[in-house]
Amino acid sequence: MNTKIRFINLLGVIATSIAMNLAVADTVGLPAPDENSAGAFKSQKHFSPYAGRNFATDVYWGDTHLHTGMSFDAGSFGARLLPRDAYRFARGEEVTSSTGLQVKLSKPLDFLVVADHSDNMGWFPELFDGNPEMLANPKVKRWYDMVNEGGQTAVAAAIEIIEAFSQGTFPMETASMPGTTTYSSAWKTAIDAAEEFNAPGVFTAFIGYEWTSNAGGDNLHRVVVYRDGGEKASVMEPYTTLEPVGSPNPRDLWKWMQSYQDKTGGRMLAIAHNGNLSNGIMFPVRDSFTNKKFDRDYAVTRMKWEPLYEVTQIKGDGETHPLLSPNDEFADYETWDQGNLDLSKPKKDEMLKYEYARSALQIGLQLEKELGVNPYKFGMIGSTDSHTGLATAE
């Protein structure tokens, strides 16, 4: 047996030697390789698949949609972590969660956008601290006592506070709105945290916020991401949805973004998400605010500001729906299709094609034929939309 194995090995050595000699013979008479004699060699296919590549191939992992206790809804349900905590966790540090647990990622993220809601940003930290001006309002004082009692009483307070804000019964004299001391402080906290933890080449801490349009309960939310540092981001406070200082119309958000760029020379983009909760108005062919057909200007403007779409996150997957893709066995993945965001209106089948990314791409091609521009040409990403201050998806 050993003799047979040795014989086989010997044949392998002989075959290798012959191949090498043939390769050498093939180059006999050719000049020594140098830059000046490159043309003297026979043209041949690159032996390296990486030769000639001049595009980026690195993949970076992160989250472009995270809420902390600065967000009105996150704070109402007990989130105590703030932007500094969020960036520390994303960079791989161990932090204490709002429930008192020690938490740490198995591997640090490469980037993070803390995207707290622009409406009423920073209100809850002030409530938790017992801001005397806020507690002078009887309703707010009652909420403060309920929150401090804890348990189901605190949960009831959270629901009551959110409903009051959405239904217009919130004591707005206590609200945190652009121009108020509370709001300015909250925005400065967000900017300072991003500046502190941004480390070029190691970790990117993006400045951002979420513009939370929810007219009639229909979701048109966008995460606004700055491509700038704190010096420019601090020039204008975030845009909100409450009139007269804000608006729920995406066109007005885009005007605000243009104003920011004109004023600062900076750059930004918006990332829409959760069309599945829009009840047919995320990717429409008519303006849901005017009921007029879109024109070329709309298509150009939307394409300019919204090159990405957040296709999946905690509130359901937004790529497609079983009724839109009946032959796709994965179309029912994480489907959330009962109604709009606050379930004030039920879902109808005819709404679906205007809610999901795949059908939106088809609609965009149709609009391009009519308008000459495709408003729904976008890349797709996934984010968490976590409201705990912790970007925990891995």
Predicted segments, located by residue:
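Gram-negative bacterial Sec-dependent N-terminal signal peptides
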Residues: 1-24
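Extended, charged catalytic domains and RNA/DNA-binding interfaces, predominantly
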Residues: 26-394
